[in-house]
Amino acid sequence: MMVALRGASALLVLFLAAFLPPPQCTQDPAMVHYIYQRFRVLEQGLEKCTQATRAYIQEFQEFSKNISVMLGRCQTYTSEYKSAVGNLALRVERAQREIDYIQYLREADECIESEDKTLAEMLLQEAEEEKKIRTLLNASCDNMLMGIKSLKIVKKMMDTHGSWMKDAVYNSPKVYLLIGSRNNTVWEFANIRAFMEDNTKPAPRKQILTLSWQGTGQVIYKGFLFFHNQATSNEIIKYNLQKRTVEDRMLLPGGVGRALVYQHSPSTYIDLAVDEHGLWAIHSGPGTHSHLVLTKIEPGTLGVEHSWDTPCRSQDAEASFLLCGVLYVVYSTGGQGPHRITCIYDPLGTISEEDLPNLFFPKRPRSHSMIHYNPRDKQLYAWNEGNQIIYKLQTKRKLPLK
């Protein structure tokens, strides 16, 4: 590097000398001395620069060496740290598994305690529910159906659908006739004889209701007519026959009235019934050909007291009735005979289908438009192909409650 600097100095001298004026005898020694001195200063500066550069290079080499040593140490430390972190991760994982196991044991104990508590609550609720049902159905009625003894055709009309009945509670001889499945006219006859003979006096009293009924599921209970309002899917009307006004109304909950109650009764969506325990509603559950739902209604306030999902299907059913708190469902094939009871439901569970004989109705050519039980005279009132029929029943005592 020094040789290069000196060569550069010589070239610089030659370059500057080329521009100097011609030598003069008196000035040449002084000028040469001046230039020489300046070049010496320049050489000294270049020498210092060279020394500084060498020192920098040496320091940089030492620094690089130190960095290499430190990087080697870092790699060693990194390996040690990786090993330590790996061991720590294994310990944390082991500790987490132990914590999860302890938590599982705690949750298992809590779950067992919760299940025991839930089971105890369910048993208590079931006991209270059973007590409530027994209290609700605690009437002086312990009969069960054993057979249909005979039938009596009381009257013949041209209308295929309709209903007829007496008051289920009041000791009144009056007979009520409701013609058709959608109407608002009630005919009131003084007694059964006046109903049977057209020309008998007094003549029937005609009453036009302010609302029309739907289906053939009407009942007379304590002087009130209960029926399904035609203008709605699930409204029950309580009509005061004496005052000729709507006394009260209610909506059955749960989507009631969207499907037919019975497959072979094409106009009845809610079938009302009366027995020794009071007022009931029979309707279909959700779905096509679903099971029947039994609902107990408090007739005074029109409040729902309880509902039961029964095992009885609406498919192939044509009618049903209640006797002493037990639901009896009448079935037929394609709407033709024989008409028989093949499904019953007892909310108290005292009787089942195995306890009953084969229950057949006397053969009729068509399905029943309605069959209603009257707890006062213990008979069935039915409508079949325009015939108003009374069925006499054979009963026996139920088994005692356990």
Swiss-Prot record:
Transmembrane segments: none
Post-translational modification (record): Highly N-glycosylated.
One Gene Ontology cellular component: extracellular space
Keyword Phosphoprotein annotated: no
Top-level lineage group: Eukaryota
Cellular compartments annotated: Secreted
Glycosylation sites: N66, N138, N183
Pfam family, one: OLF
Signal peptide residues on this chain, from the entry's feature table: 1-28
Assigned keywords, A-Z: Coiled coil, Disulfide bond, Glycoprotein, Secreted, Signal
GO terms of biological process kind: signal transduction
Main location: secreted
Reported tissue expression: Mainly expressed in the small intestine, liver, lung and heart.
Disulfide partners: C141-C324
Coiled coil: 79-133
InterPro entries: Olfac-like_dom (IPR003112), Olfactomedin-like_domain (IPR050605)
Residues of the Olfactomedin-like domain: 140-397
Protein name, as recorded: Olfactomedin-like protein 1
